[in-house]
Amino acid sequence: MNDALKTYLKGICWFLLSLVTSSVNDVISKYLGTRLHSFEVAFFRFLFSSIVLLPFVVYYGKSTLKTRHPVIHVLRGLLLFFGMTSWTYGLTIAPVTTATVISFSIPLFTLILAVFILNENIIWQRWVVTVVGFIGLVVMLKPHTKDFNPEILYLILAAISFAMLDIINKKFVVKESMLSMLFYSAIVTAIVSLPVSMEYWITPSSFELTLLFVLGSSGSFILFFLLKAFTMVDATATAPYRYLELVISAIAAYFIFNEFPDKSTAHGAVIIIPATLFIMYSEKKSMSSKHESQ
């Protein structure tokens, strides 16, 4: 095995670790959401996330928290609060696999938002594929049938919030340190979550607190795993493996919640996955063309 292949395989392994951690987070969130309100889950999740990040702040020094965009950090925190509370609540309504497929639609929302917020020009092929992707969502959610539960739309609202976060990150991540973006968004989300969570407060058990700590700290681990992966392989090379999360989620949901993906989820995934893959590869090609022309 040559060195290039070894590096590639290591990078993919790091990326797969991020997928496993993400799936574990969804399973934990669904479990906690059956007893604790999503506001309270968000409060503890980001409180523990802030605590976990504190040693890194001390190590790198206060200067790493200096920011020119405090309003942007507040906006990110508000979006994260809305997105995570909607996602946690949605997980109590829908199967984990359905939520996972909906998360695959985030690039579709990001593309549309980029047109209005970043004034990006989108080629017609990407518009066509985006429409196809949304058709996949409709196929999966079945809004035209009596089985449709409107509360599943909380997951769609969460996906839109995460797409908004992607847009903000795309515009400001080069101007801010990664640590400051993580720390401030966690602090803001915890602060915003506290007063609303008091309305629905249920004192967590020691086991639930342990799970909440895992939930809070694992977000940083996901970022670490992704950064390690992207130092070894190109982000585009990991794109096909992104959808293994559906397999991981399906296995976890089956053994823990006795859930099994229905046909509509499978049909929706078959439509959404190729659509988002095309968008990612198209964006990569567009970025490469821009660099070559400079």
UniProtKB/Swiss-Prot annotation:
InterPro entries associated with the record: EamA_dom
Chain's role: Transports S-adenosylmethionine.
Family to which this protein belongs: Belongs to the drug/metabolite transporter (DMT) superfamily. 10 TMS drug/metabolite exporter (DME) (TC 2.A.7.3) family.
Subcellular location: Cell inner membrane
This protein's GO CC annotations: plasma membrane
Membrane-topology descriptor: Multi-pass membrane protein
Protein name from the UniProt record: S-adenosylmethionine uptake transporter
GO biological process: amino acid transport
Description of activity control: Transport is inhibited by S-adenosylethionine and to a lesser extent by S-adenosylhomocysteine. Unlike eukaryotic transporters is not inhibited by sinfungin. Also inhibited by 2.4-dinitrophenol, suggesting transport is an energy-dependent process.
